[in-house]
């Protein structure tokens, strides 16, 4: 895959999708959804030696996140991000 990105079968690409829950309350609200790159591989021995808690498997991933967004108010006073552009980048929410 020359550009480093690929699509997995059954998993849509990272793109804007309308949020049906918030959109039914007025103007459409969009959020980034879809798949990006991820892989897992055995942890190299030299890396294991530097880990506080050695792990046998190392994983790498990027997540579908907003590259740009605007703030919107829904349900009277709830502030949400209305995504306007998506890309695959650092995963902000993950288990440690």
Curated annotation (Swiss-Prot):
GO terms for biological process: G protein-coupled receptor signaling pathway; positive regulation of steroid biosynthetic process; regulation of signaling receptor activity; thyroid hormone generation. Glycans are attached at residues 56, 82. SMART domains: GHA. One of its GO terms (molecular function) is follicle-stimulating hormone activity. Keywords: Disulfide bond, Glycoprotein, Hormone, Secreted. Transmembrane segments: none annotated. It is found in: Secreted. Coiled coil: none annotated. Disulfide bonds join 11-35, 14-64, 32-86, 36-88, 63-91. The keyword Disulfide bond applies. It comes from the Eukaryota. GO terms for cellular component: extracellular space; follicle-stimulating hormone complex. Belongs to the glycoprotein hormones subunit alpha family. Shared alpha chain of the active heterodimeric glycoprotein hormones thyrotropin/thyroid stimulating hormone/TSH, lutropin/luteinizing hormone/LH and follitropin/follicle stimulating hormone/FSH. These hormones bind specific receptors on target cells that in turn activate downstream signaling pathways. Heterodimer. The active hormones thyrotropin, lutropin and follitropin are heterodimers composed of CGA, a common alpha chain described here and a unique beta chain which confers their biological specificity to the hormones: TSHB for thyrotropin, LHB for lutropin and FSHB for follitropin. This is Glycoprotein hormones alpha chain. It comes from Balaenoptera acutorostrata (Common minke whale).
């Amino acid at each position: 895959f020359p550009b480093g990105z690929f699509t997995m079968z059954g998993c849509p690409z990272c793109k804007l999708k309308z949020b049906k829950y918030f959109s039914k309350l007025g103007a459409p609200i969009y959020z980034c959804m879809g798949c990006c790159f991820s892989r897992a591989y055995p942890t190299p021995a030299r890396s294991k030696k530097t880990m506080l808690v050695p792990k046998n498997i190392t994983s790498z991933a990027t997540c579908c996140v907003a590259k740009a967004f605007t703030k919107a108010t829904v349900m009277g006073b709830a502030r949400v991000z209305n995504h306007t552009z998506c890309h695959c980048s650092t995963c902000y929410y993950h288990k440690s």
